[in-house]
């Protein structure tokens, strides 16, 4: 086995992701070739569509934002050696919390509504994650199975709510009432215009910057705080619970 502590940081943070990306492109090229198309042209279009022009790059960052948030949710649990596969469902319910708070407290000043909405996302998402966490700790249910199942439950619940409960009846499709525009986060188009860059419409907004900030926060939490040390210690050795918790319980 390889001692990860002796592996240079640039190997794990640069070389390994680059190798993984290269292998993914090679496998994709193989299947494209089997399908009878030109792998070079297909991959060229993929790269150009993702990074070749500013609107495409903005869409790439827009879709990346969701993966950053759900990836961070997975990473925190993973440091405890727990596999939280329920990031998708927790994001659904967290988004529901944002909407309910924002729509019901829209009369308050915008900064306060933003703060309350973020708190609503925390509470709703954490409450949804608490159920499989409780089943794991108290009943021994496998957290991978329960979190995956809760993704489907959250998806079905959101469909029901969007169609029958919080739907805007003035709309043909399952849409909620639009939040007041003053509550919307600044868009990438507006941010680019501030720096004199003109682009067409893009769904990317300041939530990407929040995702980057959250990444630094999670890094600091895991590696620079006592709580983070306790999480990592528990993940590597459950006996450490005897020293880090007044009421220890084996999370595995």
Enumerate the language-model features and the residues they cover:
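Single conserved hydrophobic/aromatic residue that forms the stacking wall/gate
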Residues: 243-252
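Generic alpha-helical transmembrane segments of integral inner-membrane proteins
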Residues: 18, 22, 26, 30, ...
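Transmembrane helix-bundle core of multi-pass membrane transporters
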Residues: 54, 143, 147, 151-222
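Membrane-interface starts of transmembrane alpha-helices
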Residues: 12-15, 19-20, 109-121, 142-146, ...
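Membrane-interfacial amphipathic/re-entrant helices at transmembrane-helix boundaries
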Residues: 2-69, 111, 116
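Single transmembrane alpha-helix segments in multi-pass membrane proteins
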Residues: 30-35, 45-105, 122-141
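Hydrophobic/aromatic residues within transmembrane alpha-helices
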Residues: 38, 240-241
């Amino acid at each position: 086995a390889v001692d990860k502590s002796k592996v240079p940081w640039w190997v794990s943070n640069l070389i390994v992701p680059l190798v993984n990306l290269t292998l993914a492109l090679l496998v994709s090229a193989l299947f494209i070739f089997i399908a009878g198309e030109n792998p070079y042209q297909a991959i060229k279009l993929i790269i150009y569509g993702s990074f070749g022009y500013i609107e495409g790059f903005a869409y790439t960052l827009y879709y990346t934002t969701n993966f950053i948030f759900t990836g961070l949710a997975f990473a925190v649990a993973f440091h405890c050696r727990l596999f939280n596969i329920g990031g998708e469902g927790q994001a659904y319910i967290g988004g529901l919390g944002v909407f309910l708070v924002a729509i019901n407290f829209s009369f308050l000043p915008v900064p306060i509504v933003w703060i309350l909405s973020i708190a609503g996302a925390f509470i709703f998402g954490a409450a949804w994650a608490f159920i499989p966490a409780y089943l794991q700790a108290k009943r021994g249910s496998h957290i991978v199975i329960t979190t995956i199942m809760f993704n489907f439950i959250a998806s079905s619940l959101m469909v029901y709510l969007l169609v029958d409960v919080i739907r805007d009846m003035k709309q043909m499709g399952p849409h909620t009432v639009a939040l007041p525009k003053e509550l919307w986060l600044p868009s990438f188009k507006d941010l680019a215009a501030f720096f004199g860059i003109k682009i067409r419409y893009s769904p990317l907004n300041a939530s990407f910057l929040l995702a980057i900030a959250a990444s630094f926060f999670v890094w600091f939490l895991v590696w620079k705080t006592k709580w983070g040390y306790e999480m990592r210690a528990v993940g590597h050795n459950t006996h450490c619970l005897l020293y880090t918790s007044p009421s220890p319980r084996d999370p595995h």
